[in-house]
Amino acid sequence: MTNNAAAPLYSLRGLPLIGWRDMSHALNYLFADGQLKQGTLVAINAEKLLTAEDNPEVRALIAAAEFKYADGISVVRSIRKKFPQAQVSRVAGADLWEALMARAGKEGTPVFLVGGKPEVLAQTEAKLRTQWNVNIVGSQDGYFTPEQRQALFARIHASGAKIVTVAMGSPKQELLMRDCREVHPHALYMGVGGTYDVFTGHVKRAPKIWQNLGLEWLYRLLSQPRRITRQMRLLRYLRWHYTGDL
């Protein structure tokens, strides 16, 4: 019998990643026995592994997160290559966030949203309430000063939020989650990058067929040619993958 409340770990470049079989497995893992886990979720793709390799501070932030999972198809393929018996599938961060929000709405779990432009954040809140009746207990757009961080942490703590999602891009969101947990430790934190923009339709995500083929990165590159410099970095990751240096 499969235990959906547990998940194996697979190490890439010294970082242990959770191997979820699918979205259902991920949700059952995070809500094991009806209790939402506490800690930090970090989506891992090839670009983030490269950054962690070159930036000790980013690596420390990622290493400290309890729940590191394979968000990028290249990472999933590397796990399968290194561990042939691994039953792991890609769980995209944007999809996991939506699934968490739907589950939170069903369970009445209090949610605090951080990040994004004011108008995008407002639209995100409205859509979450309408679509899944999410219990949003507070929010803060991404435009606040370093001096206002402690006040934000106090608000999050006072709200009693059990899920805190932060859309500020990496590594800003990981830094904020790390510091906020010192004030409000009993919650599940999730860095979500540009997910609010996608959720509200301000940014178009790759069509499903591109996602299913593992070509979402190519769709983004064709849509945003300026990403070519970032994509060129991935040649280094490909070398790791094909030489078994993971």
Curated annotation (Swiss-Prot):
State its Enzyme Commission number(s): 2.4.1.180
Q: Which InterPro entries match?
A: UDP-ManNAcA_Trfase_WecG (IPR023085), WecG_TagA_CpsF (IPR004629)
This entry's Gene Ontology molecular function terms read: hexosyltransferase activity; lipopolysaccharide N-acetylmannosaminouronosyltransferase activity
Keywords in UniProt for this one? Answer: Glycosyltransferase, Transferase
Instruction: Please name the pathway.
Output: Bacterial outer membrane biogenesis; enterobacterial common antigen biosynthesis
Is Transferase found in the keyword set?
yes
Instruction: Name the reaction it catalyses.
Output: UDP-N-acetyl-alpha-D-mannosaminouronate + N-acetyl-alpha-D-glucosaminyl-di-trans,octa-cis-undecaprenyl diphosphate = beta-D-ManNAcA-(1->4)-alpha-D-GlcNAc-di-trans,octa-cis-undecaprenyl diphosphate + UDP + H(+)
The keyword Lyase is annotated on this UniProt entry: no
GO:BP terms for this protein? enterobacterial common antigen biosynthetic process
Explain the purpose of this protein. Catalyzes the synthesis of Und-PP-GlcNAc-ManNAcA (Lipid II), the second lipid-linked intermediate involved in enterobacterial common antigen (ECA) synthesis.
Q: Which family does it belong to?
A: Belongs to the glycosyltransferase 26 family.
- Mind telling me what this protein is named? UDP-N-acetyl-D-mannosaminuronic acid transferase
Q: Which organism is it from?
A: Salmonella typhimurium (strain LT2 / SGSC1412 / ATCC 700720)
What gene is behind this protein?
wecG
